[in-house]
């Protein structure tokens, strides 16, 4: 729709269609159009993917409009351009009596058609489910280009903004890798492993490896009270982990929470060692890992798992389950279960 991916992962590019160029142009025009309404915003990066769009927008000063209002304005402009390209007449002033005053139509539609005079007004006051039914019943051509709503992330600081911009620019490369390597770039919203459910992203085949070794470290050494990663015991453990990895057919399993766990997790990512990382953040339909873990997934060396309802698991030693203390122990208990798991993970299609 917006174009197609060209080249390879080493030299990714998006070859835009006329519609993709129109969407990109609408994005670049946001600051100028919003200035007409007294809103000061800036756009920093954008990319049209074949079937969706990414962009970074900055609000320069407080304004009466919400970000949703601005996004809706851009989406409406794109929809109108799409209609023009396809020779579809605008629907904004079409009277509802043309196709709504029909006794065979649902009662809710006839009631709303009596309230809102134009098609545009009517559409704005329908729920997503009602709109979908309306398009089917009435057979309208004037469907919106974009889905309802949008997925957003709030930028925290300048470093976060630069990471956002880098992510936007990296999208074509990521998409090429996902298409080229579907087996090791899977996103599954429901995977059952042993007695627990997870969201997953990456190489699910790592669960089949016979030798799964847990990396678990407390923050302090139980005898000396030293930071555990600074002790001789940790050095010996790490040497054993590395020996197991280099011996072959071994995958590390860890949440990477304590400093000692984090150091080993990062070494696996940097050196391409097989790793199952159990994280506390959930994996939804739009979730993707940051670049380092994404590339590890592309190399087939990483599986990211996110347990369902982590904060509803058992409290540990009377400490609430949504505390860092209980999360640390519960995630490591899950790592123990995964290491002993030798069955087949059950994947539920969603």
Can you annotate each of these PLM segments?
Residues 186-350:
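Glycine-biased, small-residue-rich flexible motifs in mid-sequence functional cores and linkers
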Residues 1-188:
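Short catalytic/metal-binding and nucleic-acid-binding patches
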């Amino acid at each position: 729709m917006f174009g197609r991916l060209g080249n390879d992962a080493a030299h990714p590019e998006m070859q835009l269609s006329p519609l993709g160029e129109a969407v990109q142009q609408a994005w670049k025009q946001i600051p100028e159009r919003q200035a007409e309404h007294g809103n000061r915003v800036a756009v920093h990066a954008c990319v049209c993917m074949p079937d969706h769009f990414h962009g970074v927008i900055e609000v320069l000063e407080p304004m009466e409009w919400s970000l949703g209002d601005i996004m809706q304005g851009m989406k409406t402009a794109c929809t109108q351009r799409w209609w023009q390209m396809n020779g579809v007449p605008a629907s904004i002033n079409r009277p509802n009596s043309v196709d709504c005053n029909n006794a065979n139509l649902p009662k809710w539609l006839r009631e709303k058609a009596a309230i809102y005079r134009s098609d545009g007004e009517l559409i704005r006051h329908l729920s997503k489910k009602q709109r979908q039914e309306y398009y089917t019943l009435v057979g309208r051509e004037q469907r919106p280009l974009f889905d309802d709503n949008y997925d957003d992330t709030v930028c925290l600081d300048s470093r976060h903004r630069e990471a956002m911009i880098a992510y936007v620019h990296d999208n074509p490369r990521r998409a090429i890798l996902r298409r080229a390597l579907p087996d090791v770039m899977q996103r599954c919203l429901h995977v059952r492993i042993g007695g627990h459910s997870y969201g997953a992203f990456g190489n699910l085949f790592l669960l089949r490896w016979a030798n799964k070794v847990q990396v678990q470290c407390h923050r302090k050494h139980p005898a000396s009270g030293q930071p555990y990663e600074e002790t001789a015991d940790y050095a010996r453990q790490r040497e054993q982990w590395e020996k197991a990895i280099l011996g072959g057919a071994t995958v590390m399993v860890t949440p990477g929470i304590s400093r000692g766990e984090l150091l080993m997790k990062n070494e696996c990512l940097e050196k391409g060692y097989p790793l199952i990382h159990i994280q506390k953040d959930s994996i939804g339909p739009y979730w993707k890992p940051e670049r380092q873990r994404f590339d590890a997934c592309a190399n087939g060396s990483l599986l990211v798992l996110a347990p369902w309802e982590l904060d509803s698991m058992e409290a540990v030693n009377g400490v609430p389950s949504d505390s860092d203390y209980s999360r640390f122990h519960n995630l490591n208990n899950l790592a123990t279960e995964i290491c002993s798991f030798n069955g087949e993970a059950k994947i539920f299609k969603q």
